[in-house]
């Protein structure tokens, strides 16, 4: 269970990254890219960023593009946040929406 401070930092990182991703010029990062969750380590050194993409066929390419733009995003995030350390960003595909839809369909059609 993350502490209250870590929870607030996660929300702030999520909000800032959602805005920053729109400024990425990489052609692989296109369409509707949503930051669904952020999980930061207690020492604030690493942050796992869960992203969801509207077009499911491009998810792997979008994640590669975000990893490529990770240095830019980390630098801009450091400028926006007032933290001692700017966490190293790790982008991960979020499949919780698909999993939830699958479970819901199983409940509807047993």
Protein language model features and the residues they cover:
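Charge-rich, low-complexity N-terminal segments
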Residues: 1-46, 52-110
């Amino acid at each position: 269970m993350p502490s209250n401070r870590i929870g607030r930092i996660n929300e702030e990182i999520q909000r800032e990254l959602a805005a920053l991703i729109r400024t990425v010029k990489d052609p692989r990062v296109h369409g509707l890219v949503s930051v669904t969750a952020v999980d930061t380590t207690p020492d604030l050194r690493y942050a796992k960023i869960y992203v969801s993409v509207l077009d499911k066929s491009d998810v792997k390419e979008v994640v590669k593009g975000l990893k490529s733009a990770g240095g830019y995003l980390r630098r801009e995030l450091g400028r926006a946040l007032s933290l001692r350390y700017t966490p190293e960003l790790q982008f991960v595909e979020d499949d919780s929406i698909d999993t939830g839809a699958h479970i819901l369909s199983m409940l509807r059609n047993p």
